[in-house]
């Protein structure tokens, strides 16, 4: 972690008394657009996360993907649905929704309930979902930076 994040002071916290399943953390660096050129730009995090979410949804992995801002939520949802259309599995589009500020409280409760009930496989959210909502049994929780 020191090498990845450039931090000198890193402390491992490995004891937690709360009951939970195993967790694994993965830091994902988007691939180069042109691997033959060392200084090449990288694939956009939105595009890369879209492919990851489609991969997870196809395998029925319950996922909440966090984005910093509303615009990222909207862009990512649009890309995921386009990718599902391209792969001719558009019916899975109904299994993923966004959750962000700007929605009415009633709409947010409907989305939460759909996730609790198992009607949704994925939510693309801002930190609006982090505040006071406990959705258990998630398989994955990527964060777009």
Where do the model's predicted regions map?
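Alpha-helical scaffold elements adjacent to nucleotide-binding pockets in ATP/GTP-utilizing enzyme cores
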Residues: 1-4, 75-83, 110-114, 137-140
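Conserved interdomain linker/interface between the two RecA-like ATPase lobes of SF2 helicase motors
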Residues: 2-73
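Conserved acidic residues
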Residues: 10, 121, 139
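Short hydrophobic/charged patches on amphipathic alpha-helices used for structural packing
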Residues: 50-54, 112, 130
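Short, surface-exposed connector motifs at secondary-structure boundaries
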Residues: 56-63, 92-95, 134-140
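Conserved helicase motor "Helicase C" RecA-like lobe of SF1/SF2 P-loop NTPases
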Residues: 70-93
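Conserved helicase ATPase core of P-loop NTP-dependent helicases/translocases
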Residues: 97-126
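A short beta-strand element within the Helicase C-terminal
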Residues: 124, 129-145
């Amino acid at each position: 972690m020191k090498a990845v994040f450039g931090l000198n002071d890193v402390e491992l916290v490995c004891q937690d008394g709360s009951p939970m399943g195993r967790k694994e953390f993965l830091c994902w660096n988007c691939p180069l657009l042109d691997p033959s050129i060392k200084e090449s730009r990288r694939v956009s995090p939105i595009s890369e996360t879209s492919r990851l979410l489609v991969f997870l949804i196809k395998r029925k992995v319950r996922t909440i993907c966090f984005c910093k801002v509303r615009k990222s939520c909207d862009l990512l949802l649009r890309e995921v649905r386009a990718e599902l259309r391209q792969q001719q599995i558009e019916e899975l589009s109904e299994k993923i929704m966004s959750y962000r500020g700007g929605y009415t409280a009633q709409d947010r409760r409907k989305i939460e309930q759909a996730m609790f009930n198992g009607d949704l496989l994925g939510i693309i959210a801002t930190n609006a979902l982090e505040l006071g909502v406990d959705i258990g049994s998630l398989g994955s929780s990527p964060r777009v930076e």
